[in-house]
């Protein structure tokens, strides 16, 4: 009986030795796309950079602000476990929609002096609890009653900001329950050559260093800089 068991063991060992070299080349010949398809949902992927591609910094001098209680739907990022891929993980799907009976029918357009819009996301927290402090700042010139009224209202109103980088990618700051809070700071200047106006600094806590909008918003239409497109005739 022992000899019979020993013989079976030897045969299995020989079969295994023969099979391993056959399987190894099959695995090595899988290309990157195929290997990526084997993983479901977000996973670490190479960060590549094409030499010579544009990388101009800065943001456009226009933004949108939405008070947190104004819309009934908001662009949101998916649950991390349900994101289809890495790009979807940091992409807010959906649009702002406002109730018919509400005060606001669309986002509030904000002008900012050229080259004054700034955004950064700094790491915060301790090990096993790292997140980001998103900070958005911009400058509105002047000393008008309308501006000071906006300052009075926005200082204690949480909400969402939409802004656009130099590559025309729109980003959103604030998510349901993790709204952006705004601190306005007015400076009237001292000398005649000084520029007067309000600097706005908005901050929000987030698990992401940036969130992009899946559906861009036409800021020029909202700002009244161009007419809204005519609906197609059915």
Q: Residue ranges of each PLM-predicted region?
A:
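Mixed-charge, glycine-accented linear interaction segment located at domain edges/termini
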Residues: 178-234
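Residue-level signal for secondary-structure boundary sites
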Residues: 146, 169-171, 208-210
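Short, acidic/charged, Gly/Pro-enriched secondary-structure junctions
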Residues: 151-173
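Short, conserved charged micro-motifs
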Residues: 145-152, 211-214
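Short, intrinsically disordered N-terminal pre-domain segments
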Residues: 1-77, 217, 225-234
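Oligomerization/assembly interface segments of phage tail-like spikes and tubes
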Residues: 125-145, 194-208
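Aromatic-patch recognition
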Residues: 118, 146, 163, 173-174
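Solvent-exposed edge beta-strands and adjacent loop segments
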Residues: 44-133, 178-193
């Amino acid at each position: 009986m022992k000899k019979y068991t020993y013989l079976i063991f030897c045969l299995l060992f020989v079969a295994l030795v023969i099979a391993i070299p056959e399987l190894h080349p099959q695995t090595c010949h899988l290309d990157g796309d195929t290997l990526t398809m084997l993983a479901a949902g977000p996973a670490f992927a190479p960060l590549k950079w094409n030499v010579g591609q544009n990388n101009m910094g800065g943001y456009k001098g226009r933004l949108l602000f939405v008070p947190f209680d104004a819309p009934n739907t908001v662009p949101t990022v998916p649950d991390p476990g349900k994101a289809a891929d890495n790009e979807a993980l940091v992409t807010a799907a959906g649009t702002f929609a406002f109730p018919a009976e509400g005060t606001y029918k669309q986002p509030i357009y904000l002008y900012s002096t050229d080259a004054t819009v700034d955004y950064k996301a700094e790491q915060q927290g301790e090990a096993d609890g790292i997140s980001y402090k998103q900070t958005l700042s911009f400058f509105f010139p002047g000393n008008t009653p309308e501006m000071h009224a906006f300052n009075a209202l926005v200082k204690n109103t949480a909400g969402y900001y939409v802004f656009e980088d130099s590559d025309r990618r729109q980003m959103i700051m604030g998510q349901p329950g993790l709204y952006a809070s705004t601190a306005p700071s007015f400076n009237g200047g001292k000398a005649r050559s000084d520029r007067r106006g309000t600097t706005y600094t908005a901050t929000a806590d987030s698990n992401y260093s940036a969130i992009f909008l899946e559906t861009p918003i036409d800021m020029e239409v909202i700002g009244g800089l161009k007419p809204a497109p005519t609906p197609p005739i059915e």
